[in-house]
Amino acid sequence: MSGDYPGLANSPELTLIGESVRAARSRVLYYRMAFGYAPADQRVAVAEITQRGDNNSLSFSQQTYYEGSRLSVSQDGVSNQAEIAQGDGNRLALVQDGNYNDADIRQGDYHNELNFTQSGDDNRLTVDQNGYGGVISGSSTGNRNSVDIDQRFASNRASVTQNGDDNLASIEQGNWGHQATITQLGSANEAMIRQGFPANDNTRLPGVATIHQSGTGNSATIIQQ
């Protein structure tokens, strides 16, 4: 499905049921929302996508030149895959409920927000925010879940909470003015925060990194350079 809707506030809702999608497993759903030259206060998109069942695949691209677009994605089942790309000023809520679900998120430019929830085992989330003023927050409940966050440019914030065993959380932030927090409750968890800083520039604020761990056999690494 694709389309241009100049002058309209779009609110599509998409639901994927496992059996019907599994019958065309080789096909990847591509859903794109594009915007014409409508007034700025009307260029707002709201989309809700649900994957239910097993082995579903989703590719979603949301592009807008104005802030305020919102997307909600829910993966409920086993071995679902979602690939999501957003422009600037977007908000995304992601829920992974089940096992072996996989989500790749790319948010560009400025002031993007992501809130995520992982519930189950062996789920994977990869986030790439390429801009400034981005905010990422969320939690994982279960075992062997992984969250990998990469924030570039400046003044981004990320907060991850994991409850369970053998989980992995990684936050990498480039440039200056970042904040990163990882909280892990359980055993054999691994946390890593890496923050960069512009060389020969004393006018920029350095990053702030915090790791909290409770349990046994955990590993924590903070690199600021």
Residue positions per predicted region:
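Long, low-complexity, polar and repeat-rich extracellular regions
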Residues: 1-225
